[in-house]
Structure formats: structure tokens, C-alpha cells
Amino acid sequence: MPSYFSRAAAPAAPLICTGDHAQVRAQIDGYRAAFEHLIQVEAIPRGFRWIFRAQPGLGALLCALAEREADCCRFMSFDVTDDGARIVWESTGDASASPIIDEIARLPERLRDEPRASHDLAALKRSAEAAGLVFTAATERS
């Protein structure tokens, strides 16, 4: 499969998110747009796989989302590939990141359950923190 994006996890990277409020909101908005084309979510060893119906421009969107995630969440590996009919996103990490990775895997469901354009970033942040993710920048408006 041709690869759009691939980056391995950084060894011993801390379980942190460096995104600020605007970055996190933009990322969530990007996911919301991408998930309109999501056809399947699969658990894989140490991570998850999101499978999308290929659409014009979707590969570029997913590549940009994965690159921003890889810059922020260095404890995870990201691979986005294309087989022509489908675009596949895989994310994995080591056991210490498992609860966080599981939480991220549920993002399509969480955003589907929260269909408002002004989705509740604070609720998403609380879920990620409960899974063990530490935010190093303010993601909630004061």
C-alpha cells in the first residue's frame, strides 16, 4: 500500500499533549470532517486502525492530522496508507500508553455522540486526562 505518512514513536517519550486550545479545536474539527468517511474501526495489537472510504482530498487531510498528532503525541506511532479504495490510519504505542490510545480510538464515537460544531473540548480533555494524558498547554479558554 502506498504510504501517505509514517512516523514511529519516540523511545521513552512522555505521555503528554502539547497542543493549545486553538490547535486542539482545529484538530478536532479536522477529525470531524474525516470521520464523515470512516467505515470501520478495528483494535490491533497495541493500538487501533481507522479505515476510511477514499475520497478526493481525504488522504491529504488525514496526513496533516497524523503529522500534527505525531508532533504532539510523540509516544505513539502513526501510519496512514492508501490502497486505492480505502485509506487506513494505524496508531500504536507501548503498554504505558494503552489507556490513552484506547481513548483516542474512541474519538469517532465520541464526536458522533456530540454532533454540535461547538463540541465540548473540556469533556474530551477530561476523558484523555482520566486515561493518563498530561496536557502541557491550556486547551480550555479561561
What are these regions (language model features)?
Residues 65-69:
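Short, solvent-exposed amphipathic alpha-helical segments in soluble enzyme
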Residues 1-64, 77-142:
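Secretory/periplasmic and organellar redox-cofactor proteins
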